């Protein structure tokens, strides 16, 4: 019986086995789906239903960077328990997987699973005996010698970061590499979610605005009860909301206040820029928390990360800006299952 791509896809969906193993199973079993599934399970390749339902939120990250800093790769592989994550077999799997991704640059996890390495990965998982998942990875490459790349992996192998910057010259790129490692260390600690405020989803910003304003209002109710100074309630939380119209309106309001205070119009030009900058600062809290370029740089609290990189490039007579970064932290965003042992025992006794 001819084995079609659709059959392989269906078997893959029902067993979570690599594509090549699914095809081999179907060929061996003459296209019989049930027999092919059994064939995979006998060899420990197919995920059992019980194992598939378990949560893999522990694990390690892998990190590899070229000797000439032209390319770097980060990988996250999850296990169910930290005990397995510290196993030599698991550590070796992370190392091998990182090297494979670094060398072959697969498009995504599914693409890697469909290769011969996917079969190797599955066999390694069977030996380890726990649910293991290759969750995500990213490789950043330099298009030319004017792109600087560096990265950092934390000592516990649970956080890894890569940062790249576009520079005006090879000289600037080489000089900036140590700085980029510091930026990567900054990102590992400060947990930015995006490169710039421009990367925020509009709906996310809107929802965050409503939520944050409501939180501040509730906090102010308690502060008022305690007769303490109230917090400022912003109109906005991100630069992406501060359109030309919004800023013009804010500037007009500042001038109206100065006029009401009787300040001479001749000195407004000296006052307005500072107050407008304060308005922007008060209304961009989301950017300062979650956008890498707008975060306060941990090694110089007078500069943002973006400004610090520009300053470092300027010191060597060049220009530079961060254009990409990736930060992987083990288990980030995965909801861990908390077992209620008493409830489990009660259920078994009922």
Swiss-Prot record:
It is found in: Cytoplasm. The keyword Metal-binding does not apply. GO terms for cellular component: cytoplasm. Coiled coil: none annotated. PROSITE patterns: EF_TS_2 (PS01127). The keyword rRNA processing does not apply. Associates with the EF-Tu.GDP complex and induces the exchange of GDP to GTP. It remains bound to the aminoacyl-tRNA.EF-Tu.GTP complex up to the GTP hydrolysis stage on the ribosome. NCBIfam families: tsf. This is Elongation factor Ts. It comes from Sulfurimonas denitrificans (strain ATCC 33889 / DSM 1251). The gene is tsf.
